[in-house]
Amino acid sequence: MRLYRDRAVVLRQHKLGEADRIVTLLTRDHGLVRAVAKGVRRTRSKFGARLEPFAHIEVQLHPGRNLDIVTQVVSVDAFATDIVADYGRYTCGCAILETAERLAGEERAPAPALHRLTVGALRAVADGQRPRDLLLDAYLLRAMGIAGWAPALTECARCATPGPHRAFHIATGGSVCAHCRPAGSTTPPLGVVDLMSALYDGDWEAAEAAPQSARSHVSGLVAAHLQWHLERQLKTLPLVERFYQADRSVAERRAALIGQDIAGG
């Protein structure tokens, strides 16, 4: 079979044998692709750090029976350096990568919109100019929109009556009117659904002006909505929710953990 090229984000990797790795890629034109990078764990590997998670690359692959084979890699954007340097950025980035893999669908199904959204989100996280919690929630909302799971925010999820509506019910699909409101609905504080709409629409001026209390409520609703559709919790989200306010590097975090181990031992 013929070689093919594509733009890709490296989502994750794991060891294969003594020198190889299997990489999971979110490509623009071929969706999720799992491929073998031969010899990448050797110090003289021609691929080096270009196949680390968070990398945005131009990749050439040879189709295989079960796994494709990476034959060439060119770096497009080196997001990893800035993301890994800060623990908050790192956990936010990990949540983005995990979400992208879960929402990409079947392997080799083209995912240009999700690929474009993921690249933009990683670029914003690496840049560090916007609050990480807002960046992540905006990404989750828009990624769910691409997958067809976005919550109803401006109309009733059941009858489509235009809002705003105060009640919110995850299993029904988002905001619900007083007539359709099912048992178990929540009533988020004023401004919470408006903030979700601002994040979905990319209205960053309104989003960044929202109080911390509204941002916390939004994070909870967005995470719950996503996990209801996925039918399980993302492994990385609890870490982001706990540590996103701390501007501590990965090295500092590891040093603190080592210090705790020493003190406890």
Swiss-Prot record:
Keyword DNA damage: yes
UniProt-listed InterPro entries: ARFGAP/RecO (IPR037278), DNA_rep/recomb_RecO_N (IPR022572), NA-bd_OB-fold (IPR012340), RecO (IPR003717), RecO_C (IPR042242)
One of the GO biological process terms: double-strand break repair
One Gene Ontology cellular component annotation held by this UniProt entry: bacterial nucleoid
Record has DNA repair as a keyword: yes
Domain of life: Bacteria
Keyword terms of this UniProt record: DNA damage, DNA recombination, DNA repair
Function: Involved in DNA repair and RecF pathway recombination.
Similarity-based family: Belongs to the RecO family.
Protein name: DNA repair protein RecO
Organism: Mycobacterium tuberculosis (strain ATCC 25618 / H37Rv)
